Amino acid sequence: MSKDTKIISDLRSFFAKNDDNRAIKCIMGVMEHINIRSSQIGVEKKENCKFTTLQVLNLLMLFPFFVVKNASRYSNSSLSKLFNCDKDMFYRFMNDGNVKWRKLLYAMNLQLIKKISSSTTVHHNKPVCLIIDDTDAPKTGMTTELIGRIWSHVHQKSILGYKCLTMMLSDGVSQLFLDFSLHGEEGKDKQKVQGLTAKQRKARYTEDHEGQAVKERVDEYLMKKTDKAIDMVKYAIKRGVRFDYLLVDSWFTNTKLVRFISSRHIKCHLLGMIKLGKTNYATKQGKMNAKQIIKHLQKEKACKHNKILRCTYCTMDVKLDGVPVRLFFCKRGRKGNWNGLLTTDLSLSFLEAYRIYARRWATEVAYKDCKTLLNFGKCQSVHFAAQIASFTLTMMQYNILCTVKRFEAYETIGGLFAEVTNDTLELSVTDKIWAIILDFVLEAAERYSIDATELLADFIESNPVAHTLRNMYIYKQAS
């Protein structure tokens, strides 16, 4: 991963002796060409530590590939037989608030993006998308720094943990985690801020982070996710990331985001779900909200039927706070609920918009892969800096797996991971099987008036088989 360390090159040489270790050799090959300098990490080597900070980072990134669940399990792993060290070395590194994890993640991603761009011989015309979404990060330790209760849409109740806001880059073939932030929720009960009593809040671990890199992350904790999403996109553009569409769900689609995207100097558009609420849009017939627009289009008999998606849809160009946008409304069946999409791209057709937006479901698969394979959010440290470190490492590991999968003959991240860890994973499915399941979910959503996207996400989250089927479908479509 750098010129001043031999860990990755030594491992690659070690596995090169056996032709059966193709997967791990591919991972070593990707990591070896990622150039991260020690100065980018933000902390210096400890005098009593035989490894440099860059070598410690390398070893941490290798944990899941050598079936090391956490630092406490390192001494019994095969990796420790090659690079012997004490577990406290890893704890000290992860607890250090001076490590610049956001910059490290971007330093890796920009090199992976460059590798993907230069190594892809067959170019496709699929748009590049930024996808912003969030997921629950449940916790059990009440003394963890900044811990609190959050509302889980999956479980429909408050749980102890963090909300993890993520931003992914997808080109329709593979996706990379670009950025993330951890958030808490103040809650409505002033007597129990963040869902905790005064005694519980006092029992949490606290630390002064002034002057540390993690201070930026602490400041993000109670920041509105909609505002942080804009900051993430700003930073991505600043670092040279280019995209065609920003995909968001109805929680993030608002006037501020529409104005922000439409004012960028690069050519990009917003494509997001909208709530059928009280937001007014300027039309030729005057100001109308979403429900009024639907009634107007029905009255004008402007609704059409799409045979491919088997749904009724209608379209109208309007203005939101002076910004021209196109609205799409669709429903399945006569009694189905209407759903709305908004885009700043006035040239986009309904079918194109639907297909592009469907890519957002890939985030659910990515979350599932990270949680089941890479210990996403499983860090047990009370230090908030260690929580940030753990999430970043997981995303780095996932991005490496995605890059290897793209250029090698692996259909899924799970299949690649299984081969790396000498495990077996039977993956056999066809597009038709997934199509049947998708139809079932859509019909159930229509019959019981449930949001299809949320139902599908919950189905994938709670059912390993459904997750595998969806995973296979995405990658087969991409190929």
Please state what every model-predicted region is.
Residues 38-114, 171-176, 230-239, 243-250, ...:
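Short, positively charged, Gly/Tyr-enriched micro-motifs
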Residues 140-143, 254-263, 279-286:
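A short acidic (Asp/Glu
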Residues 266-279:
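Acidic, His- and aromatic-enriched active-site or binding-groove loops in soluble protein domains
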